């Protein structure tokens, strides 16, 4: 306190010395070590740091890769050298997300305008109040200075938080910039409405999901597609391909929506597939998913459910599309059963209409790589 409280050398008045003089990067380069145990008076707990570190996944803007992450590495290497921490590298994996962008607008006086102050008519933009034509600029990273920002509260009020989350993740891979558009938000909102209608289409509250063992092709196809898309969503999320996960969720929705229920057994299969769909959607749209889970008759919380397991027997394809080559060049394709014999596949390949144009004599050799490719040598 004696050092902090002093006399100003210019005006001789009472003053306080500034204590926060470290650069921000200096102070933020080892916070993850401190976060492992907050309940002490030392810099960080070596025991807790040994348990938690290194950080499994770092997510941040690309600008961090050459500033914050670089300094963090320096700190960890220095602390490791003086035996204060066991790691040399602070982070196992890095994912740099893109920016949310929006078109910029200016009025006739070259003043920036908010998107909410502008409306579109045909291919031109106009000022909401004056109806004057507006200058349409580049699509750039959202910034307050250029006013190309969207108030999240407006989106939540008009569409709900789930719609905003769904659109942001569905538009493009997370590492790429995305353009925020009203049409894109509206499209996400329409899909969630279709999902809601599917959930409420039939009363599934009294349907018990018992043994899932389809006995006909229609039911088998639904279950196979369900597990196929469960597998796709799972892998996509693990690899941060959220846009691909949402594409698979949309595909599963279409399969369920097109499934015709003609008996109680059909409702069992449908409820099972809908249950899987709800769980897959829940990390992206938690609010509507929790409601949907309750509507189909569940009394427990959706957030307490396990992630769907993969049943590999349903991922196996009964039929495959095999390319046919003639002297190494692809000339046709045939669809065959996975257990087809080599003699049968030879007959099918040689009887293919397009192959007959190129194979006019007895082939010298027919090379078959099972379930992969056929090459006819002439």
Tell where the protein language model's regions lie, with residue ranges.
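NTP/phosphate- and nucleic-acid-binding module
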Residues: 11, 22, 40-41, 212-215, ...
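A generic structural signal for well-ordered coil/turn residues at beta-strand boundaries
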Residues: 2, 26, 90, 95, ...
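Acidic, turn-prone loop/beta-hairpin segments
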Residues: 94-119, 207-232, 247, 251, ...
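Short secondary-structure junction motifs
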Residues: 86-89, 289, 360-363
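Structured secondary-structure scaffolds
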Residues: 1-200, 225-257, 272-279, 376
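Long, well-ordered alpha-helical segments
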Residues: 197-209
């Amino acid at each position: 306190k004696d050092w902090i409280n002093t006399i100003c050398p210019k005006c001789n008045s009472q003053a306080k010395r500034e204590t926060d003089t470290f650069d921000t990067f200096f102070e933020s380069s080892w916070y993850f070590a401190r976060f492992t145990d907050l309940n002490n008076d030392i810099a960080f707990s070596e025991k807790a740091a040994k348990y938690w570190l290194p950080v499994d996944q770092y997510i941040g803007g690309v600008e961090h890769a050459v500033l914050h992450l670089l300094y963090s590495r320096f700190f960890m290497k220095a602390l490791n050298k003086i035996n204060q921490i066991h790691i040399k590298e602070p982070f196992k994996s890095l994912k740099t997300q893109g920016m949310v962008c929006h078109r910029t607008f200016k009025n006739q006086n070259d003043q920036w305008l908010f998107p909410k102050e502008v409306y579109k008519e045909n291919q031109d933009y106009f000022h909401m109040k004056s109806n004057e034509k507006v200058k349409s600029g580049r699509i750039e990273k959202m910034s307050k200075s250029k006013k190309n920002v969207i108030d999240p509260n407006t989106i939540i009020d008009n569409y709900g938080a789930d719609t905003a989350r769904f659109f942001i993740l569905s538009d493009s891979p997370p590492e790429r910039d995305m353009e925020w558009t009203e049409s894109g938000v509206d499209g996400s909102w329409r899909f969630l409405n279709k999902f809601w209608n599917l959930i409420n289409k039939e009363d599934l509250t009294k349907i018990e999901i018992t043994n899932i063992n389809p006995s006909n092709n229609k039911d088998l196809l639904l279950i196979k597609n369900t597990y196929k898309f469960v597998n796709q969503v799972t892998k996509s999320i693990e690899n941060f391909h959220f846009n691909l996960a949402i594409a698979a969720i949309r595909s599963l929705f279409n399969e369920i929506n097109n499934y015709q229920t003609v008996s109680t057994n059909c409702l069992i299969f449908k409820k099972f597939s809908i249950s899987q769909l709800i769980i897959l959607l829940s990390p992206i749209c938690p609010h509507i998913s929790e409601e949907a889970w309750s509507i189909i008759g569940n009394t427990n919380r959706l957030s307490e459910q396990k992630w769907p397991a993969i049943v590999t027997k349903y991922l196996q394809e009964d039929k495959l599309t095999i390319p046919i080559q003639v002297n190494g060049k692809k000339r046709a394709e045939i669809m065959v059963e996975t257990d087809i014999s080599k003699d049968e596949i030879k007959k099918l390949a040689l009887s293919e209409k397009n192959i007959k144009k190129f194979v006019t004599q007895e082939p010298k050799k027919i090379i078959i790589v099972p379930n992969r490719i056929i090459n006819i040598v002439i």
